[in-house]
């Protein structure tokens, strides 16, 4: 059953069943598929993804670090106005409203592989909670560096990383950094280490270290922080952070909060590593439009999660094969890479057992130039899922 779900493409469910069972007259019905699918759980797909990744060691940055990008993405699912957790009212993106789930993924940028996933109803998304859960159950060892955008900047996220003994690079807004430092303006360039004492009380008389009063930061009961008891106002938590401010383009500066030491990572090193985070953005494009994660075959959120996990497994399967395909270097203007779209189609057939004569040789025939300096504005599209009715059959 899991093999079937992983190998599904963008056709209708009947078509996918026919292909998987090689057009046998005893092919299972849709109803039989639904009954067997209900016996599965998300934990089975999570276990399969982890065990599959562990069979193929991840590539390390500088021979030591795993660079793990974390980011969110959205997937439109079948319209159901009666589901308040996923339904969005009509707006500029949709005239009839739409249903959506939100995902937060971990992606190792050097190996080009997904490591873990959190799926949340679109209306109940909580990226802070998601990345904390992903850090808590990280299971790949080594020296991971979590890299995330400014939407993940929070005291609770920093503390979870420190408590789980993982490093991080997280971009932060100017306003947040000003509050950390207790200043009104920021210099163009900055590289400093700060110590903050987090507490649930605003009373200076109850602070344990009055000589460090400027380092105290108050967290109210309504703000999640898992290492302070909300009912114990005497509880305190020491947080040590490094703040680096770098120029990303002419006159444009960004703040990056990290736990990496100055001895091991200069500001330029941090800027370089953070820029590698863009790999997860391009992987979302391949995941949605090449692997076909937008062409779902399920309506219920639980079963949508099955398909999203299966797309990650399939993406990793294709990525592992593609990264082992040698691309011949020739005297050309550009460096070249494998055409992921065509390579994925070949890997699809290979997974189904329709083995081409030589998978790696066939994939290496289809290559594309690498143009690293290309930039395009992000397009805003109408929010609409792929219909169950109008698909290739």
Language-model-derived ranges and their functions:
Residues 49-50, 54:
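Glycine/small-residue-rich loop that forms an oxyanion/phosphate-binding "nest" at active or ligand-binding sites
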Residues 88-89:
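Amphipathic beta-strand/beta-sheet edge segments enriched in Tyr/Trp
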Residues 1-11, 19, 33-40, 44-48, ...:
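Single, function-defining residue in the core of a domain
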Residues 16-23:
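Short alpha-helical "recognition helix" segments of helix-turn-helix
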Residues 66-68:
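Conserved beta-strand elements of the Class I
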């Amino acid at each position: 059953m899991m093999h079937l779900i992983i190998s599904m493409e963008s056709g209708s469910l009947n078509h996918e069943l026919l292909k998987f069972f090689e057009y046998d007259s005893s092919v299972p019905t849709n109803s039989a598929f639904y009954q067997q699918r209900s016996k599965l759980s998300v934990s089975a797909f999570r276990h399969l993804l982890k065990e599959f990744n562990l069979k193929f060691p991840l590539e390390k940055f500088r021979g030591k670090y795993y660079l793990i990008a974390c980011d969110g993405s959205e997937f439109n699912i079948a319209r159901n106005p009666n589901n308040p957790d996923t339904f969005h009212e009509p707006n500029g993106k949709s005239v009839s409203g739409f249903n959506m789930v939100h995902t937060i993924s971990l992606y190792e940028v050097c190996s080009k592989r997904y490591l873990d996933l959190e799926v949340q109803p679109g209306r109940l998304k909580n990226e802070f909670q998601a990345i904390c859960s992903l850090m808590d159950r990280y299971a790949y060892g080594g020296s991971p560096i979590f890299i995330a955008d400014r939407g993940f900047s929070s005291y609770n996220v920093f503390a979870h990383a420190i408590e789980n003994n993982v490093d991080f690079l997280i971009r932060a807004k100017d306003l947040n950094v000003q509050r950390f430092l207790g200043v009104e303006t920021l210099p163009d360039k900055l590289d400093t280490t700060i110590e903050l004492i987090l507490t649930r009380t605003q009373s200076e008389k109850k602070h344990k270290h009055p000589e460090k009063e400027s380092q105290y930061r108050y967290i109210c009961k309504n703000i999640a922080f898992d290492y302070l008891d909300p009912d114990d106002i005497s509880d305190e938590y020491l947080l040590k952070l490094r703040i680096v401010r770098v120029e990303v383009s002419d006159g444009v500066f960004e703040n990056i909060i990290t736990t990496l030491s100055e001895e091991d990572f200069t500001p330029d090193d941090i800027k370089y590593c953070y820029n590698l985070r863009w790999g997860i953005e391009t992987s979302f494009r391949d995941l949605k439009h090449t692997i076909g994660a937008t062409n779902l075959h399920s309506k219920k959120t639980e079963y949508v999660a099955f398909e999203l996990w299966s797309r990650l497994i399939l993406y990793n399967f294709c990525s592992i094969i593609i990264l082992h395909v040698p691309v011949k270097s020739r005297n050309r203007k550009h460096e070249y890479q494998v055409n992921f779209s065509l390579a994925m189609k070949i890997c699809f057939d290979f997974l189904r057992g329709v083995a081409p004569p030589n998978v790696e040789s066939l994939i290496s025939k289809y290559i594309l130039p690498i143009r690293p300096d290309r930039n395009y504005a992000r397009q805003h599209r109408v929010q609409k899922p792929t219909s169950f009715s109008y698909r290739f059959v």
